[in-house]
C-alpha cells in the first residue's frame, strides 16, 4: 500500500491546502512522521502534541485543534466513521509504501516475494483485493490508485 500524510478537519472549516494551517493548531501524535514533517517544513503551524492516537482523535472531536494529521490510511478510515469530518488533504509529504519484510540475508524468500508481487500485479490482484477487503474501510469516494501499489511499482 502507498502511504503519505493526510489531514482531517471538521466539515465546517475544511482544510484543503497545507497553507490554510498557518496560524492554526494542528493535532499530531508525539514521535510520529507528522510531528517531524510539520516541525521541519511548516514551523509556523502550531502543533498540539498528544501521547497516543486515541488522545489526538479525541482532541479533534473536542475542538482542541483545527485539524489532525497522521498517515492518510488512518485519517481516511477515521473520517468515514466520524460524520462531520473530512480528509481535505489526502496526500502530503513523501510517498512511502507498506511492504512485506523478510529477515536480513534471506535472499531466497526476498526474491520469491518480489517475483510473486510482479506476477500478481499482472493480474491486478492488489486492486481486486482492495475492492474485496478495504473498499468498505476507505469508502466509495476513496481512489484505490492513491493507496494501492500494483506489481511493486509506484
Model-derived segments and their meaning:
Residues 1-11, 34, 72, 76-134, 136-154:
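Periplasmic-binding protein-like
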Residues 9-26:
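Flexible hinge/capping segments at coil-to-helix
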Residues 25, 49, 64, 124, ...:
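Conserved functional loop/turn residues at catalytic and ligand-binding sites
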Residues 27-41, 110, 128:
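Secondary-structure junction motif
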Residues 23-24, 43-46, 84:
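Loop/turn elements at helix/coil->beta-strand transitions in domains of secreted/extracellular proteins
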Residues 19-20, 40, 54-69, 73, ...:
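Short helices/loops that flank or line small-molecule/ion binding pockets
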Residues 28, 45-53:
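Short beta-strand-to-loop elements that line the ligand-binding cleft
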